[in-house]
Design a protein with these regions (language model features):
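Structural signal for interior beta-strand "rungs" in well-ordered beta-sheet cores
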Residues: 1-72
Length: 72
């Protein structure tokens, strides 16, 4: 099981990216964020501090997810 991180991404400290997750190019993953298994964060998206994504979630291109959100 492999996670994939695209080019020119920013992954801040204490961010957790689990198995089979895909972070496309130019994404910013903030501190204390959990990207659960098989989730996809599409190109150019910002995922705020403390966000948790459920397994298999797809975050659309150029999305902005507010800090502390739960994405189902």
């Amino acid at each position: 099981a492999n996670a994939k991180i695209g080019e020119n991404c920013i992954i801040n400290s204490k961010a957790l990216i689990e198995h089979d997750a895909i972070i496309e190019d130019f994404c910013h993953i903030a501190t204390n964020t959990v990207i659960n298994g098989a989730a996809i964060v599409r190109q150019g998206s910002f995922v705020g501090s403390g966000v948790i994504t459920k397994q298999g979630v797809k975050v659309e291109k150029n999305s902005f997810i507010k800090a502390g959100s739960l994405v189902k």
